[in-house]
């Protein structure tokens, strides 16, 4: 997620900003010298513990290094043990403030940014955080030994200069108002961590970070605990006051979601988030919920919606034709699923910027056309003449023209246009090859969705396979693009930016481990991504994202799923207190970890 940060403080000259915070555009809530964020309790007691489960689908971990492609790092390590030059907050999704850096200066031409480090900043080994550590971190993260997304993310950085012991400057290849935000969000670790090894050979060496927690007890691969650093350098800093109150934060990892939920009811951990509507409606009930042992709550939030869908691997020849992809999408009867499977709990995903100002609607507006016209020859003419594609809405009215039968008839016509017809018991191309579809999953939770979907696809002649594999196998197959159709979710953003280069850019399409899972390779998309990154005003950003969303949706690169408007969470009663104010923009796990605190019963070890 791209973060906007607001430049605050004193104008030192017409060409340089210097402040405790920086922004691409917008206003800020907290002035220089503010005491604490509004959604925390600055006098919250320290102590107690909270036990959680991995927010990802990982069932184990095999390394402590979160920056390499191979293997799985434990949950929580990056956010609890490592820190960045700047930190965001949950009031303002586009604003951040100094953390490791106490001062930030952006040149008027936006070709460089200089950070001055806080002299109080210390790593867990007691060493001061110095400019050479920041440069060491950057050099490591942009090396070929690191996961490829870091090289994409920092691709516009021309170089890093150690100005003095506590001053570091990032030079940029071109003026880009977002770049100070990007480098400000880079994890910083000590130059002593793995100094004698290539980054991809640092596996079980514990990162030397500066965060509020250190590594505690570990059952390697299964459970991990983090312990609060009593000498944490930033505990009295305004961006940390009233935060990270638990003495111990632990994670337990389970083989599957069934074992995980049974562990929760048995008291093995304290907090869980539900992602499946059926489980929330049918599983989160019974004696423990009725007698108040477990609390079940739907939390409101203002986050942009996440995109989720079945994503095609367009590197495969059979998915190259957009008509084929569109036809497969027409076979999903979402309305039936929402009635029968989802308890009417979801809204259909329409585009790649769910529920935000960046979502394309109807025909392109004037600002979009100004971006699209110069590339008209590269684009489908329908982009200019037809409303942006929406997922099909299945009607039960035979006269509507939008029944499932109507959609399947339309899909059959599209497949025929693309050279796929039904004969000899299957959908075949001119060579006689049958069209198979493999849906890959790791938890089995998509089975109830794929089963009715597969029945509709089989009516068109597809041979459908639903395959469940271990998370590690799934991750590896995703990394090397060895899949056909896969369910995937990407986080929404209040300010999309450079992360989209990695998600949709041609340069990342064939880079193993990249987040361009679909394999998008489109010069028009690349040109629009450049407009997104180069946006100087929010209006320019909105126009560029809407145009990008429009082009991607006309490409039918995925079968959109659904999203919910609330966080569905449950926790053990009597063990925690929380601030009176709930922020607008937050993820529940990080909000609970960073702002809640232990009750006297928790301190006493009562579960």
Predicted regions mapped to residue ranges:
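Surface-exposed binding/hinge segments that line
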Residues: 116, 150-195, 210-219, 364-377, ...
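Aromatic- and charge-enriched surface segment that lines or borders ligand/interaction sites
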Residues: 40-45, 67-76, 103-147, 163, ...
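Aromatic-rich, solvent-exposed beta-strand/loop patch
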Residues: 98-108, 124, 129, 153, ...
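Ligand-site clamp/hinge motif
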Residues: 118, 201, 234-284, 326, ...
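N-terminal lobe/hinge region of extracytoplasmic solute-binding protein
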Residues: 18-108, 139, 208
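Extracellular/periplasmic solute-recognition and catalytic clefts
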Residues: 159-162, 216-227, 252-316, 323-327, ...
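Detector for C-terminal structural segments
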Residues: 21, 54, 219-224, 228, ...
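Gly/Pro-rich hinge or "lid" segments in bacterial periplasmic/extracellular proteins
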Residues: 71, 77-94, 184-250, 255-259, ...
């Amino acid at each position: 997620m791209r973060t906007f940060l607001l430049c605050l403080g004193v104008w030192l000259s017409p060409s340089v900003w210097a402040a405790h915070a920086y922004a691409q555009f917008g206003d800020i809530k907290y002035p220089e010298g503010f005491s604490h964020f509004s959604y925390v309790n600055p006098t919250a007691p320290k102590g107690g513990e909270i036990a959680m489960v991995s927010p990802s689908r990982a069932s184990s971990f095999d390394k402590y290094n979160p920056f390499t492609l191979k293997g799985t790092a434990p949950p929580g390590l990056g956010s609890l043990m490592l820190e960045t030059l700047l930190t965001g907050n949950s009031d303002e999704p586009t604003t951040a403030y100094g953390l490791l850096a106490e001062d930030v200066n952006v040149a008027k031409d936006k070709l460089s940014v200089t950070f001055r480090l806080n002299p109080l900043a210390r790593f867990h080994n007691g060493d001061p955080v110095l400019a050479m550590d920041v440069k060491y971190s950057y050099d490591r993260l942009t090396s070929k030994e690191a996961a490829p997304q870091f090289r994409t993310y920092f691709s516009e950085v021309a170089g890093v200069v150690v100005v003095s012991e506590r001053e570091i400057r990032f030079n940029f290849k071109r003026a880009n108002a977002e770049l100070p935000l990007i480098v400000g969000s880079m994890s910083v670790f000590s130059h002593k961590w793995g100094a004698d090894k290539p980054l991809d050979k640092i596996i079980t060496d514990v990162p030397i970070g500066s965060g509020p927690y250190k590594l505690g007890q570990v059952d390697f691969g299964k459970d991990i605990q983090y312990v609060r650093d009593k000498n944490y350098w930033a505990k009295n800093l305004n961006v940390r006051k009233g935060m990270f109150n638990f003495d111990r934060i632990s994670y337990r990892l389970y083989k599957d979601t069934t074992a995980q939920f049974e562990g929760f009811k048995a008291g093995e951990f304290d907090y869980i988030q539900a992602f499946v509507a059926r489980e929330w409606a049918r599983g989160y009930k019974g004696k423990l919920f009725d007698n108040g042992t477990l609390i079940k709550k739907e939390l409101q939030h203002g986050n942009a919606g996440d995109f989720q869908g079945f994503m095609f691997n367009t590197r495969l020849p059979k998915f190259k034709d957009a008509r084929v992809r569109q036809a497969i999408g027409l076979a999903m009867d979402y309305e039936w699923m929402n009635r029968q499977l989802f308890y009417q709990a979801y809204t259909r995903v329409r585009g790649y910027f769910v529920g935000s100002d960046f979502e394309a609607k109807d025909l392109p507006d004037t600002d979009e056309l100004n971006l699209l016209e110069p590339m008209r020859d590269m684009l489908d003419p329908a982009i200019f003449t037809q409303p942006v594609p929406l997922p099909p809405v299945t009607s039960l009215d035979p006269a509507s023209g939008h029944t499932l039968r109507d959609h399947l008839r339309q899909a059959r016509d599209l497949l025929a246009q693309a050279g796929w017809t039904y004969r000899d018991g299957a959908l075949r191309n001119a060579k006689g090859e049958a069209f198979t579809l493999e849906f890959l999953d790791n938890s089995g939770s998509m089975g109830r969705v794929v089963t009715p979907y597969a029945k509709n696809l089989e009516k068109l002649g597809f041979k459908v396979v639903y395959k469940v594999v271990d998370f590690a196998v799934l991750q590896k197959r995703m990394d090397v693009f060895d899949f056909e159709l896969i369910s995937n979710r990407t986080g929404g953003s209040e300010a999309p930016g450079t992360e989209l280069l990695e998600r949709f850019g041609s340069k990342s399409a064939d880079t193993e481990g990249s987040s361009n899972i679909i394999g998008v390779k489109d010069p028009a998309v690349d040109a629009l991504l450049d407009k997104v990154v180069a946006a100087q005003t929010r209006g320019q950003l909105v126009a560029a994202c809407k145009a990008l969303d429009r082009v991607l949706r006309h490409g039918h690169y995925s079968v959109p799923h659904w999203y919910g408007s609330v966080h569905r969470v449950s926790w053990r009663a009597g063990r925690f207190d929380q601030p009176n104010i709930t922020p607008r923009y937050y993820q529940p796990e990080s909000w609970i970890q960073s702002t809640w605190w232990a009750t006297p019963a928790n301190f006493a070890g009562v579960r």
